[in-house]
Amino acid sequence: STLDVVQFNHYNTQENLWHVALWFDFLRTLKEHPMWNTETATCWNGSTEITQSVKPEGFCRVNSWMPIALGGEANMYWLWRTHWAGHELMHGAVLDASGRPMHTAGEVKQIAADYEKAADFINGTRVKSEVAMHFTARNWRIMDTQHVVKSLNYMDTLNDSFYKPLIDCGVRPDVIDAKQPLDAYKLIVSPLMMTIQEGDLPARIMQWVKDGGTWIAG
């Protein structure tokens, strides 16, 4: 089957917004384009209850630019306008149910103007990296179902101990699945991999190393 579009939604807060970057760096590698962020929160979330509150000024701007800066091609606000009845009545939005702008509307308007100014650069460039970090669903499942290391949370450790240190060093990695091609990379980091038996990775990475690639595994 053909994958038509890669899309992502999140409701991270200012405290953990940086966690989302790993997902954008991963989703970007799945398909050349398009990759869309289809639920960008302007403020709080809310289904049957509100579990977040008003975000600080500037949060919406950062949250809106992240998917675009990291390779996305669309950024859609959820909600654009609050419901007049039914589910998620308390969800944050750009406009309220009557159509009046909510407190973040001015920030959204400025973001749209900034997108327009940067349109030629955004449309004319792609996010490329010579460094990759492996992340696979199989290894995630193994770590979650067979606790090889007591109390180790796979995603938190991957983010805090491997991904973030790369970012802090000024390295912008592609986050790749085991089946992804390796040719574009000079350095590949494969953390927390309980198995590499996916996508013929052992043979492919051995050849890649013989061809001059540097592999950090552990």
Q: Where are the model-predicted features located?
A:
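Carbohydrate-binding surfaces of carbohydrate-active enzymes
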Residues: 4-218
